[in-house]
Swiss-Prot record:
Molecular function (Gene Ontology), one example: lipid-A-disaccharide synthase activity
Pathway stated in the Swiss-Prot or TrEMBL entry: Bacterial outer membrane biogenesis; LPS lipid A biosynthesis
Gene: lpxB
Lineage, uppermost ranks: Bacteria, Pseudomonadati, Pseudomonadota, Alphaproteobacteria, Rickettsiales
EC code(s) of this entry: 2.4.1.182
Keywords recorded for this protein, A-Z: Glycosyltransferase, Lipid A biosynthesis, Lipid biosynthesis, Lipid metabolism, Transferase
A Pfam family annotated for this UniProt entry: LpxB
Catalytic activity: a lipid X + a UDP-2-N,3-O-bis[(3R)-3-hydroxyacyl]-alpha-D-glucosamine = a lipid A disaccharide + UDP + H(+)
Tagged with keyword Glycosyltransferase: yes
RNA-binding in keyword set: no
Function field: Condensation of UDP-2,3-diacylglucosamine and 2,3-diacylglucosamine-1-phosphate to form lipid A disaccharide, a precursor of lipid A, a phosphorylated glycolipid that anchors the lipopolysaccharide to the outer membrane of the cell.
Any single Gene Ontology cellular-component annotation: membrane
Protein name: Lipid-A-disaccharide synthase
Organism of provenance: Rickettsia typhi (strain ATCC VR-144 / Wilmington)
Amino acid sequence: MKKIYFIAGEMSGDFIGGHIIQNLKSNEGLEFTGIGGQYMEEAGNFKSLFTITAINFIGFIEIIPHLLKIKKLIDKTVENIINSKVDLLITIDSPGFTYRVAKRVRKFLPNLKIIHIVAPSVWAYKAGRAVDYAKIYDCLFALLPFEPPYFTKVGLDCRYIGHPILEQEFYRDKIALRKEFKIDDNESILCVTFGTRKGEILRHLPIFITAIQKISKDYKNLRIIFPLVHPDHEAIIKPFLENVQFNYLFLSSERLKAYAVSDLALAKSGTNTLEISASGTPMVVAYKVNIISFFIIMFLIKIKYVSLINIMAGSAIIPEFIQFNCRANLISNKLKELLSNSQKRDNQVVESQKILQKLRFASDRSPSYIAAKIIKQEFL
C-alpha cells in the first residue's frame, strides 16, 4: 500500500487536491492522508490532521499574531509526515505554510519525493523563489502556460497542467436559471463576494454594502445574491444588512449557479474571479489589505493588475479597484456604468473568454487527470 501525504491550506487548494485524489482513486493500492478540507475528505478516505482554517492566513502584517501558532502547526505536520512513513508528499499552493513544511521534511527525509502544485508567482514578485523551490521539490505543476520556463531554467522539473478550477461544470443558461430562482424579467441580479477568510470579509463588507446601497437607489429592481463559501459566513455578513434598502438572498451550496444567473458581479480579487468569468458574467473586482502589507507588496510586486484575466491580457478587461481606490463611490459608479450598458458587459465577457481559453487545459484531458497520471507513472 503506497501512502500519499497531501497538504492544502485553503479552499482552492482543497478543491485541486480533491480532484486529483478522485483521479488517483482508481489505483486501489493507494492511501491518502494529510491536511485538507471538504473536497479532499469527500474524494477519498481522507481525514485531515487539523482544519485548514488553522493555516488560512493572508498578508504580511495580518499573519504576525498567528506566527507562534503556525510554527507549532508546522512542527506538528513535519512530525506527522515523518511518523506516517509516506511514499510521496504533495503540497498545494499556500506557500507560506507548505514551503516551510517541505523544507523541513527535506532535511529529515532527503530521499522522499516531493511535488508542489500551483507555481509561486515568481513572475510577479520575489523571483528568487524559483531557486529556493528547485532545492526542495522534485517536480512542480504549473497552472499557467507561461510559468514553466521560470523554473526549468534553474533546474526544477516543471509541468504545465492547466487550471483545475476550470474543470467544473459551469452553468450558461441564464434563462433557465432565472426561472429556477424565480427571478422576474424586470429584475437585475448583482452577485457579491467578499472573500473566504473572516478578515477579508470584514474588510470588504462595509465598502461593498455602501456601494450596493448607492446603486440600489437608482435600480429599484436590483436583487443581490451573496454566495457563501462557508455557511458560517452568513453570520458575519448579516449584521451589516440590518438597515439596507435592497433585496438580497444567501446561497450556501450553489455558488456557480449564483455566478451564472447574475447580470453583473462585484468580486473580491481571487480564484472566484475565474469562476465568475467562466460563468459568462461580467464583473468589477475590488481588493483591500492592511496598509502596511500593501506597501510591502508594492515594494515587491512587478505587475500592474491583480486579476488573472487582466494579468494574462496585459490590460484592464475587468475594472479593478485596489486599496486606495477600493472606495464605495468609485465602485458604485462603475457598477452603474456596467448595469446601464449591456454592450460593455458583453464585451468584457467576450474578451475574458479569449483569455480563459488559454487557461483551460494543457491537452484534451483535465488538469487533475494529467496531474494524477504523472504522479502514478513517475512518482509512485
